[in-house]
């Protein structure tokens, strides 16, 4: 899937592997299968533990992992791998259960929040008049989960301020997702005679 959170996790994992670290990823499966496998992401091989999931009808690619037994499955992976830290990407399903499993094994947990409740509403089945209430509930739930982290980050300072205000958390670190600017550098000399507009927005 092409989205900011997925690309962030992919680049971070790939960068850690290239620096010699052992990285394990826990993520929903693309189909109804499950279990560990070797996958190539960001140009490197890594172990991905896939969780059984189901397609969300109102989204082209989003899959919803089965919650039944998820904590136990994640706990089994953590017990076998014994990571130095667990890094979750949201307070929702996988992140929530990973936190529970990690805490029981006294592992450090870091979270990078990518979730914006406003962006979830367009894929919900709720009537529009309920969206403000739903967003308030999601933010409150996010705060309840994210306050349990050993460290909490977001990609930008503005996102950190928003998270602290909306989810009532503190000490959020703004750490950029990082972009390899050399991949986008233009080797052809240019001038400013023709105006160029660049739009940066969501693909979905």
Residue ranges and their predicted role:
Residues 55-59, 111-140:
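Acceptor-binding helix/loop patch of EC 2.4 sugar-transfer enzymes
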């Amino acid at each position: 899937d092409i989205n900011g959170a997925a690309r962030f996790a992919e680049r971070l994992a790939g960068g850690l592997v290239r620096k010699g670290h052992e990285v394990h990823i826990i993520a929903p499966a693309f189909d109804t299968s499950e279990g560990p496998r070797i996958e190539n992401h960001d140009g490197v091989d890594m172990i991905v533990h896939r969780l059984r999931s189901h397609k969300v009808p109102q989204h082209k690619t989003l899959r919803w992992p089965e919650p039944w037994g998820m904590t136990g499955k994640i706990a089994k992976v953590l017990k076998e791998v014994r990571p130095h830290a667990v890094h979750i990407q949201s307070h929702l399903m996988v992140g929530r259960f990973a936190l529970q499993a990690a805490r029981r094994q006294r592992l450090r947990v870091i979270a990078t929040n990518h979730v914006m409740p406003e962006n979830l509403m367009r894929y919900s089945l709720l009537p529009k008049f309920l969206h403000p209430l739903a967003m308030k509930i999601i933010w409150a739930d996010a705060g309840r989960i994210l306050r349990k982290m050993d460290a909490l980050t977001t990609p930008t300072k503005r996102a950190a301020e928003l998270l602290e205000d909306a989810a009532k958390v503190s000490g959020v670190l703004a750490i950029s997702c990082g972009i390899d600017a050399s991949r986008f550098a233009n080797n052809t000399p240019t001038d400013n005679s023709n105006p160029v507009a660049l739009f940066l927005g969501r693909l979905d």
